Amino acid sequence: MNTTTSAAGRSLKVLVAEDNIINQRLVISMLTTLGHTGVVVGDGEKALKCLAKLKFDAVLMDVMMPTLDGLGALSAIRAQEQTTGAHLPVIMATAHGEPGDAAKYKRAGADGYVAKPIEIDQLNAELKRVLGIK
């Protein structure tokens, strides 16, 4: 496991939309280990409010959350981008992974996908890929 090399060679700011506190802590720990900063919200509605106030390099979005699920939040993010013209990379995450999920979420507008439990190398690789970092 290569946990000392960050995805960008610089610190990223990642919005983590995840309702499970254990998963929140694990992802924040991984991001910190990679040299990044994470901001946690517990549902899609809070994610949209946070995105309206703060700038992020990427979003890690749980699929199944209360209030507004990850796909609903993703749809709202992509609709907002039509107005702003700015693209925000979104990586979807789910514990109920099935074959074809990555393609399904890509069709819904996601840039990337990780299956839970998330591994640090998997997260790092997907951040690099969606941000176009070699």
Language model regions located:
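Conserved acidic carboxylate
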Residues: E18
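Charged docking surfaces used in two-component/phosphorelay signaling
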Residues: R25-T33
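C-terminal output helix
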Residues: I28, I118-L127
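Helix N-cap/capping motif at the beta->alpha junctions
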Residues: V40-K49, G70-G72
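Active-site beta3 strand of CheY-like receiver
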Residues: K55-L60
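Receiver (REC) domain active-site loop signature in two-component systems and cognate sites
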Residues: M65, G97
